[in-house]
């Protein structure tokens, strides 16, 4: 629908992932947690649930690909499924920093614009690299807008069903609604014209 209205995937992709919580309680009929959900640590905080990985167009800010995994899967593993192959630039946080070969394999013309680590063991902070990362993060912020709509506006910050399959379907529908919501201005202008 959006491609019919002139919205198309351009030449850049921003990749990122977010945690979607699941109940870790065993106070249910089965006396067990959901076997497809797992726990992971982010900083010093532990989470139980799944991850929603998305690829967002760097110009329009609309999601074009998504993968759902359990929370213990590292962000780099679903990276090939998030790229469409025609990218000229790939943006990501430092979780994707060492994936240059994987990016080149899926999108041969793509330049790697992932944030690099600024602190090496026993070394000073690299201020030049920190400034480069800050500029890349201004573009990467577009993926966070999609997550904000999915989690805050549509309420998908916790899973509703057991298992990844049903929750993946809900995630994909929510992303489709988020795309329509984020593109509402130009879509309404076309309708009014």
Protein language model regions, located:
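Helix-centered, glycine/charged polyanion-binding patches within enzymatic domains
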Residues: 88-89, 94-169
